[in-house]
């Protein structure tokens, strides 16, 4: 298109041709040659406005916000030289940043920044690949005063242009430069609208990312037919909020008010939110949004499954614990109780033993166990032994109702001694029954040793019929309870056996 723009009163910088420009050593590694057809461009400081002459176009570039070179001194200037496809020698000046454009592939443009070692490719037809580059270079640091025209912003005005065909057909569009972007419907068209407004001119230099640079060369191939693919680009409308509405506001009176008026408030509402830019910069792609959705949905499902599984497991574990824990708890106190019982029993036995010993000691001190002087081997006879036993039994303590009698039973001749066995019978007769039905017996044994001398006393021992405890005279105190236990057990036994009276 041969649309001409009115240049401002500022001076434009001349463009160097590769045939006349001097080649200098590049500061960045591996700069690429430029094959852009017969168009030259010059880069000026961000403070200066953009000048577009008859066959010359100027683009202002600002360094990345990371390097903090958004505003350069007015003395220093950056030039971009575009050489013919035949001449492949790049022209680079010292202390200057160079950007080369290559259009070897159809509908694609490759931008290399020699200073920052970055390469970016831009599709002229589809605007999707431009978004990740904008994401990498972070447009969010642009000053709020300067109105930035993002590459995706023209989507909304282009859609509106598709609906209003008279924008391309109106004759005054040739005179007004902002009508050009409506015709080719490319992201550069929106830059033309910005150039129409004098105060908005600095908005172009604010765009640091490389993808904005190739937007200017897209102007020549902008036919009206491209409006249709732009309409198809409407699905990319979500990134449209990045475009500031202030730049679109001036053309509203030129175009029909009914169509442009609704667009402005919607864009303003989107611009008010400062976080929209950050969100678009970070996840602008549709696949990223899908991934985020998947990430959001999958953890919820997993959490639900895990929660259900955990609940089921916990239920099972709870059941097991309910079965096991009470048993363990019951066992533990049981064991503790046993330990306590054992300790109590041990303590009781110890205490009882101590008490018994003390009582015995006191009793022995007050009433010692009585004993007699037994016969010697030279004095011993069977009859004397019986009398000795009756004399010994008389020393025991028992009630007067008990009567006893001792008699000799037998003599056992062993190899080394003679055993003389005696029986003492106890009974408790009454006036009703002078002859007791049962009696308690105690068996005494006098051991006469054949090898011992005659002056040594004989060995005496005795047991009661209800126990096998072997007792010796003077060692254990006699208890009347022993006799009662024997007689009671015999009474119980006799009552259990029926007798026939003849």
From Swiss-Prot:
InterPro entries: AKAP, AKAP_28. Testis specific. Its main location: cytoplasm. Residues 199-265 are annotated as: 8 X 4 AA repeat of P-X-X-P. Residues 11-20 have a biased composition (Polar residues). Residues 1-84 are annotated as: Disordered. GO terms for cellular component: axoneme; cAMP-dependent protein kinase complex; sperm fibrous sheath. Keywords: Cytoplasm, Repeat. Signal peptide: none annotated. The keyword Repeat applies. It is found in: Cytoplasm. Residues 24-84 have a biased composition (Basic and acidic residues). Sequence repeats lie at residues 199-202, 205-208, 211-214, 217-220, 235-238, 241-244, 250-253, 262-265. Residues 258-378 are annotated as: RII-binding. GO terms for biological process: spermatogenesis. It comes from the Eukaryota. GO terms for molecular function: protein kinase A binding; protein kinase A regulatory subunit binding. The keyword Repeat applies. Binds to type II regulatory subunits (RII). Binds to type II regulatory subunits of protein kinase A and anchors/targets them. This is A-kinase anchor protein 14.
């Amino acid at each position: 298109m041969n649309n001409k723009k009115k240049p401002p009163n500022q001076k434009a910088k001349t463009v160097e041709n590769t045939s006349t420009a001097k080649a200098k050593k590049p500061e960045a590694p591996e700069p690429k040659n430029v094959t852009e057809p017969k168009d030259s461009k010059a880069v000026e400081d961000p403070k200066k406005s953009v000048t577009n002459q008859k066959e010359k176009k100027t683009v202002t570039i600002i360094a990345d916000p990371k390097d903090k070179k958004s505003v350069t001194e007015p003395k220093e200037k950056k030039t971009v030289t575009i050489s013919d496809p035949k001449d492949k020698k790049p022209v680079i000046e010292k202390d200057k940043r160079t950007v080369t454009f290559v259009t070897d592939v159809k509908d694609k443009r490759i931008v290399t920044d020699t200073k920052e070692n970055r390469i970016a490719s831009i599709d002229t037809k589809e605007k999707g690949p431009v978004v990740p580059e904008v994401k990498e270079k972070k447009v969010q640091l642009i000053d709020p005063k300067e109105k930035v025209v993002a590459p995706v912003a023209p989507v909304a005005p282009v859609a509106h242009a598709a609906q209003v065909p008279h924008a391309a057909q109106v004759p005054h569009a040739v005179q007004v430069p902002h009508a050009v972007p409506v015709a080719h419907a490319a992201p550069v068209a929106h830059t033309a609208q910005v150039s129409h407004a004098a105060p908005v001119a600095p908005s172009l230099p604010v765009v640091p990312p490389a993808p904005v640079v190739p937007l200017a060369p897209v102007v020549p191939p902008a036919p009206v037919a491209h409006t249709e693919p732009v309409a198809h680009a409407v699905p990319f409308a979500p990134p449209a909020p990045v475009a500031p509405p202030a730049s679109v506001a001036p053309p509203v009176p030129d175009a029909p008010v009914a169509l442009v008026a609704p667009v402005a408030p919607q864009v303003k509402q989107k611009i008010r939110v400062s976080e929209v830019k950050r969100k678009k910069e970070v996840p602008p792609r549709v696949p990223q949004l899908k991934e985020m959705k998947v990430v959001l949905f999958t953890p919820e499902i997993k959490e639900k499954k895990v929660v259900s599984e955990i609940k089921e497991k916990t239920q099972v574990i709870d059941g097991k614990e309910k079965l096991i824990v009470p048993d363990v708890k019951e066992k533990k106190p049981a064991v503790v109780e046993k330990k306590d019982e054992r300790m109590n029993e041990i303590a009781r036995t110890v205490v009882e033993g101590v008490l018994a010993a003390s009582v015995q000691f006191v009793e022995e001190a007050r009433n010692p166990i009585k004993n007699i002087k037994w016969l010697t081997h030279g004095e011993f006879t069977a009859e004397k032994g019986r009398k000795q036993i009756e004399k010994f039994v008389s020393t025991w303590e028992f009630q007067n109702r008990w009567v006893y009698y001792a008699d000799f039973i037998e003599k056992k001749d062993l190899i080394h001694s003679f055993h003389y066995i005696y029986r003492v019978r106890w009974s408790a007769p009454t006036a009703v029954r002078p002859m007791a039905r049962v009696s308690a017996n105690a068996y005494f044994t006098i051991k006469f040793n054949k090898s011992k001398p005659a002056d040594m006393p004989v060995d005496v021992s005795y047991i009661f019929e209800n126990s096998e405890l072997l007792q010796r005279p003077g060692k254990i105190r006699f208890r009347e309870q022993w006799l009662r236990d024997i007689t009671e057990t015999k009474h119980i036994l006799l009552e259990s056996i029926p007798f026939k009276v003849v």
